[in-house]
């Protein structure tokens, strides 16, 4: 007697593929950034890396509907607005500016900043959903602290 195919098996295999792509590209990027002679070349690849990670998340997301697109759009628009206020009016985060690492800028703010914010917020949200923290408040606080820590770590590169 034949066993019916497991419809989840294909989903599990593609999730493993997406996770493998994320791990591989992050390890290669980290290695390139840590080797002084390769650092300038790898910094030029940062926008492409962010776009690749965006593609991986979009392709792996289970339900792309109006709510998801609204979520993405709000992050893109909101993050650009917040960064514009920070860079041009020195509000919220103090006095700072972006270098060329994140690529093309519109009014001193990299256009890809929305992708970066989306990746960070989405990934942190997934991590907090899968965490063992029972309290929603603790997940929100932990997620916010994690985002601040990540920002402190990646800010020098941007």
Region spans (language model):
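Aromatic-rich, lipid-facing transmembrane alpha helices and their immediate juxtamembrane interface loops
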Residues: 1-158
């Amino acid at each position: 007697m034949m066993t019916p195919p497991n419809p989840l098996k294909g989903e599990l295999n593609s999730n493993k593929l997406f996770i493998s792509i994320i791990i591989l590209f992050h390890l290669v990027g980290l290695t390139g950034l840590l080797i002084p002679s390769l650092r300038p070349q790898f910094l030029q690849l940062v926008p492409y890396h962010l776009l690749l990670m965006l593609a991986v998340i979009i392709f792996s997301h289970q339900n792309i509907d109006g709510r998801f697109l609204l979520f993405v759009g709000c992050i893109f628009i909101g993050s650009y607005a917040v960064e514009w206020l920070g860079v041009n009016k020195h509000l919220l985060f103090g006095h700072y500016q972006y270098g060329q690492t994140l690529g093309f800028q519109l009014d001193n703010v990299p256009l890809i900043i929305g992708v970066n914010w989306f990746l960070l917020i989405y990934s942190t949200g997934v991590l907090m959903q899968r965490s063992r923290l029972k309290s929603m408040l603790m997940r929100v606080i932990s997620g916010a602290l994690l985002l601040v820590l990540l920002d402190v770590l990646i800010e020098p590169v941007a």
